């Protein structure tokens, strides 16, 4: 089977090179496919005829490049895509010719040829549905082709995943045709998402992806294709219904590339449900905050009167500093300050002011003593002159010592001056003596005299 598929693929490559020279190499096909994905998602959002036609032109050509069933199939698909932009009615004939070409080129695998024939019809129906959804004739042709493609999609999903190893994109097109007839646009996004996988990955990966997705598409085909094949407007009606939930799907449906039309309302319901918890979550969020604020407010007033008497030593300190400025009344005022909280302290402070200073000390031993002493210092300046004179006596002693030292220094200086004056006077008396007298006598004459 693999050898037959490889031979068919090589033969298709040779025919593709001979009949139609592709401008772009096959290495860049996945890039085109992803570009087609982006464009297809844009067309799903806008749901316009022109955008859908452009998308089919951009997406179908890379699909044909990646298809490996036959070269004639590639060429015929390119011709059909070119014809889709021009004429819509002539496409089923070209698709039928493409199917004949495919069957003639692939005589080895009958099942693959039949699936290829159904695939080509499905692809042509896709191009017709995507390129010209407004024409009634093309819609009827798609409607007539859709049952066969639905049946072929069922067979492709159930019986021929083995033959769909290389022509995986085409098999996905067969699985997509009912979904395109049902929803129109999102199926192409799945097709484009699957094409690079089927073109680059081996058969096992394609079987895994195609078996799951084609089965889901086949199940939706059973539900959606009969609705779409009966009248042509029914095809447009689900497309409109699919287009209506598409705008809310934009952030999510484009990312995972919605596979089935059934997934769209599911995503819509999730979109609808997600804002509800998001809205509800902030609503309870402020309510506990309000509760906490009310609790904090309730706690603050309750805590504020209670610790005021307990923490009163700190305000007592503040109150003590101004109240102790008048010397006779500091203790009574301090007793009146905390007296509002504790009455027995008033009696104790009135009886013994010393105990009042020791009263706040058990509350805060070091805090109240310091301001008490600080407050007592300015008050005691008027009360205890003896206490204040002690540093003054020391200063006077220091000053007296300095004065004594000055007097001693002055007396010494005066004595030195007197001595110098006496010596000067003596020298002045002896100025008349000459040097000869001094030499002869050895002394001054006045000294003897």
UniProtKB/Swiss-Prot annotation:
Tissues and organs where the protein is expressed, per its UniProt entry: Highest expression in heart, placenta, liver, pancreas and colon. Also detected in brain, lung, skeletal muscle, kidney, spleen, prostate, testis, ovary and small intestine. Lowest expression in thymus and leukocytes.
Coiled coil: none
Sorted UniProt keywords: Cell membrane, Glycoprotein, Golgi apparatus, Membrane, Signal, Transmembrane, Transmembrane helix
InterPro entries per UniProt: DUF5585 (IPR041056), Erythrocyte_Invasion_ImmMod (IPR052660)
Record-level GO cellular component terms: Golgi apparatus; intracellular membrane-bounded organelle; nucleoplasm; plasma membrane
Positions on the Extracellular side per record topology: 21-400
Secretion signal, residue range per the UniProt entry: 1-20
Subcellular localization: Cell membrane; Golgi apparatus, trans-Golgi network membrane
Bias (Low complexity): 154-184, 215-234
Residues annotated as glycosylated: 49
Side of membrane Cytoplasmic, spans: 422-449
Annotated Polar residues bias: 255-279, 352-367
Region annotated Disordered, chain positions: 72-101, 154-187, 215-381
Record's bilayer topology term: Single-pass type I membrane protein
One Pfam family named in its UniProt record: DUF5585
Transmembrane stretches, start-end: 401-421
Protein's name in the database: Uncharacterized protein C11orf24
Organism: Homo sapiens
Classification lineage: Eukaryota, Metazoa, Chordata, Craniata, Vertebrata
């Amino acid at each position: 089977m693999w050898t037959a598929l490889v031979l068919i693929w090589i033969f298709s490559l040779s025919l593709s090179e001979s009949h139609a020279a592709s401008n772009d190499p096959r290495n860049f096909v996945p890039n085109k496919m992803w570009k087609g994905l982006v464009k297809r998602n844009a067309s799903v959002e806008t749901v316009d005829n022109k955008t859908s036609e452009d998308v089919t032109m951009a997406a179908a050509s890379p699909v044909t490049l990646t298809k490996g069933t036959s070269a004639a199939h590639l060429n015929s698909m390119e011709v059909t895509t070119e014809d889709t932009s021009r004429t819509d009615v002539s496409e089923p004939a070209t698709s039928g010719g493409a199917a004949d070409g495919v069957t003639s080129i692939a005589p080895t695998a009958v099942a693959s040829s039949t699936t290829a024939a159904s695939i080509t019809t499905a692809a042509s129906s896709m191009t017709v549905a995507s390129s010209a959804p407004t024409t009634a004739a093309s819609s009827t042709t798609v409607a007539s082709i859709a049952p066969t493609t639905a049946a072929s999609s069922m067979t492709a999903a159930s019986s021929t995943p083995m033959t769909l190893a290389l022509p995986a994109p085409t098999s996905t097109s067969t699985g997509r045709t009912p979904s395109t007839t049902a929803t129109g646009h999102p199926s192409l996004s799945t097709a484009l998402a699957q094409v690079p996988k089927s073109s680059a990955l081996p058969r096992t990966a394609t079987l895994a992806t195609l078996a799951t997705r084609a089965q889901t598409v086949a199940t939706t085909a059973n539900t959606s294709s009969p609705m779409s094949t009966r009248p042509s407007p029914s095809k447009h009606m689900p497309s409109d219904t699919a287009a209506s939930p598409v705008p809310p799907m934009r952030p999510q449906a484009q990312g995972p590339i919605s596979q089935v039309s059934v997934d769209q309302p599911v995503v819509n319901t999730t979109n609808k449900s997600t804002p509800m918890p998001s809205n509800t979550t902030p609503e309870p969020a402020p309510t506990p905050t309000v509760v906490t604020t009310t609790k904090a407010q309730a706690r603050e007033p309750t805590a504020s009167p209670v610790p005021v008497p307990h923490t009163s030593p700190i305000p007592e300190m503040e109150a003590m500093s101004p109240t102790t400025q008048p010397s006779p009344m500091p203790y009574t005022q301090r007793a009146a300050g905390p007296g509002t909280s504790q009455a027995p302290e008033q009696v104790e402070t009135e009886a013994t002011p010393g105990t009042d200073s020791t009263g706040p000390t058990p509350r805060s031993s070091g805090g109240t003593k310091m301001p008490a002493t600080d407050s007592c210092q300015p008050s005691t300046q008027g009360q205890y002159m003896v206490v204040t004179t002690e540093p003054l006596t020391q200063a006077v002693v220091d000053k007296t010592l300095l004065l004594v030292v000055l007097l001693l220094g002055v007396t010494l200086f005066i004595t030195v001056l007197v001595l110098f004056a006496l010596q000067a006077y003596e020298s002045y008396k002896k100025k008349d003596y000459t040097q000869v007298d001094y030499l002869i006598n050895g002394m001054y004459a006045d000294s003897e005299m």
